[in-house]
From Swiss-Prot:
GO molecular function: structural constituent of ribosome; tRNA binding
Function: Involved in the binding of tRNA to the ribosomes.
Domain of life (superkingdom): Bacteria
Protein name: Small ribosomal subunit protein uS10
Subunit structure: Part of the 30S ribosomal subunit.
Pfam family, any one: Ribosomal_S10
Gene Ontology biological process: translation
Lineage: Bacteria, Pseudomonadati, Chlorobiota, Chlorobiia, Chlorobiales
Gene symbol of the encoding locus: rpsJ
Alphabetical UniProt keywords: Ribonucleoprotein, Ribosomal protein
Family indicated by similarity: Belongs to the universal ribosomal protein uS10 family.
GO CC annotation: ribonucleoprotein complex; ribosome
Length: 103
């Protein structure tokens, strides 16, 4: 049995619509090269909550909370060709999307 190569692409952003849009665009590019693809797989959303005092030095009970969520998607490509990798490298992702690629 031959060993299969895998590429895992993890997309992260604070805007869920941006992550979904670019995940679909990556899938469209990979489908053109006849590689097997799994995804986009939604990973758990992480909420970040920060609590700060409203006043600079008094009123400890008066606080304000700020929160934001980071959304993640995973795309797995099985048996990528050199054409697949070249097309993925040519994609220009926006600055709001963080991409992590593992092979």
């Amino acid at each position: 049995m031959a060993v299969q190569q895998k590429i895992r692409i993890k997309l992260k952003s604070y805007d869920h619509s941006l992550v979904d849009k670019w995940a679909l665009r990556i899938i469209d590019v990979v489908k053109q090269t006849d590689a097997i693809i799994f995804g986009p797989i939604p990973l758990p959303t992480k909420a970040h909550i920060y609590t700060v005092n409203r006043s600079p030095h008094v009123d400890k009970k008066s606080r304000e909370q700020f929160s934001f969520s980071s959304h993640k998607r995973l795309i797995e490509i099985i048996n990528p060709t050199t054409r697949t990798i070249d097309m993925l490298m040519k994609l220009e992702l926006p600055s709001g999307v963080d991409v992590e690629i593992k092979s």
